[in-house]
Amino acid sequence: MNWSQIISLVSAGNYMEVEKILQDYPYIVDMADHLREQKLKVIANLDTYVKRTMDSVEKLGGHAYLAKDKDEARKIIGDLVGEKKTVVFSKTNVAYEIGLREFLQERNNEVWETDLGEYLVQISRGWPTHIVAPALDMTREEAAKAVKKIDPSINENSKIEDIVAAVRKFLMSKYVKADVGITGANAVAADSGSVALVENEGNIRIDTVMPPMHIAVTGIDKIVPTMRDALDEVMVQAAYAGIFPPTYINVTSGPSSTADIELRRVSPATGPKDFHLVLIDNGRLEASKNEDLKEALLCIKCGRCYFSCPIYRTLGKEWISTKSPYNGPTGVMWNYITNKDPWPASYCVHSGGCKEVCPMKINIPEVIKYIKFIGSKQVGK
Amino acid sequence: MDEDYVKKQEATIRNVLVKNLMESYVPFPLDKKIATQWAYAINVPRGGSTIIYTSYMYQMANVFKSYEKYVPTFGSLGSSKIIASIGAKLIKPKEEDIKRFNAILQNIYRIVKRSNENIGYLYEEEPYSGSLLYELGFMDEFKEYGKKVFELFKQHKVSNIITIDPHTTNTLTNLKKYIGFDIPFTPYLNLIKEAKGTGKFVLHDSCLYSRFLGMYESIRTTIRSAGVELVEDPTVTGKGAGFCCGGPVGPLNDKLSNEIAKARAETLTSVNKDVLVACPLCYANLSEFCNVKDIAEVIA
Ligand code: SF4
């Protein structure tokens, strides 16, 4: 199958699957509407919510940091991890945004992606094609070819199940000796300091409890007012990504703890003894103050808008390429927020499907039009 | 994507567009005799308070389609006079296209005349709406030119406009938003009452009509009421699943525009072999890859 065949199939599949999920679980639509309102509150007052979130994390016995840009974020995490460690990553777009994996590798750490798609991208030295399904453009044969490098028993005739099992075996050997687990966050609750993550593979569960240190790194846009909102966000994200119910929802509130003796909560227990939340600004705060741009911060990265975009469906990852892990309609907005790069917007054909399918009802074409305008001002007269 | 090429192309297009629009109200030199002959042939009244507004869209659709091809020629030329003479030679629609758009425009005129006897046309004095400026993101230039268009309509004492394509309708909607353009306008599709038509089609939605101007349902009702059968498939014609013909990216990347058109034509023809469109640019883009008809070719 070539890209155009894969994407046509996947797009039609996602469209119908999400429609069915919304019929079977009609409350998801209400949750999405409520979530939009709650996220708007945060955008209107981002500084306050960042502070509230950081205070909540510290109260739990965790540590919270705010990095203003990529360099600061890398330095904070680099210092926490140190050198010659084994680090397991769950899929995190922010880590791509700041070039974290390469940075840690350069500092003599062994770093492994544990999400299957992301792992395939890592071992084939590629770049994620889609925020939810990073290896969307890979066929079974291509995946087998990549995995053969770590397990010679895999060949081009191997079944998908065998490829998955080979990766699982390999990753298990890394989990047991991992010093640090690095995850992203689907949402962070300002009131409780909890990080919510949704997944199906089980790798995030392991990444967040097995290594003695858990670092969650995410953008300040992922902050929501309450724990309830955080759980809403993971449910809505999973539904609009087309996988519902999700196999796992993970909530982490500080380092592991127990209150089993005399009901006194102490840390650590079985899981990590250290929990760090690294919040990244990298253009988000500025965007929250820009009337034309701020709606983009509502994005919950469900990846649905990609499928309704004619440019993404034609160019795939070549559109925004390695400039950003965000692609498709949301990627045009997010590549601008994080890199100040207006050019991918020039290709927007204002097809408008993106705004129809977006759970957060972001007027994506309108935001992109603004970015186009910024680009047009930079074009020589 | 080739960022440097895009920057260069955008700069050239803007210069060519702005120069032509500010001097002559058209985006590139075009033969107005050809563009207006449809109206001369049926004696459409000149001017009037209610006008049919073509914005040259049906007449220029094929040129827009090949805009990227023309732009380097425009860009390498100096004064507007040279552009005009070379452009006039370059930009002449094919005979068969002229015949086709004349018939479409005349049919649309007859359809709208049923709801209002006194509909005029500005002939050579009709301005192009400026859609391309808006769609390429040249907002400052769009507003500046929009004011000129608004003034021109006022000079002609126009108080009611009937649009016939989605790009112009969308542009007037935005002129209203950005510069207070307050002359009422209605797309002709919303004025159709007793039209008749036949055939079985899959509708390729105009992105602007269906996803920006709230006409997704009403367009279907109009077509079906005329007796035309529409075949639907939610993954192809659903409001959020259907996608563009590729036209708008044509000026920057013709190859990409064609690839989108080809992909769109493939999904559409998987539903039904004959495709119906509501926009001249959709027609120009898709007709290379499938059998397409404009709504105004199947209802009368
Ligand atoms: S912009 Fe909307 S549809 Fe696209 S990824 Fe974000 S939330 Fe999902």
Locations of regions flagged by a protein language model:
Chain B
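Ferredoxin-type iron-sulfur electron-transfer modules in oxidoreductases and energy-metabolism complexes
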Residues: 1-18, 255-263, 295-300
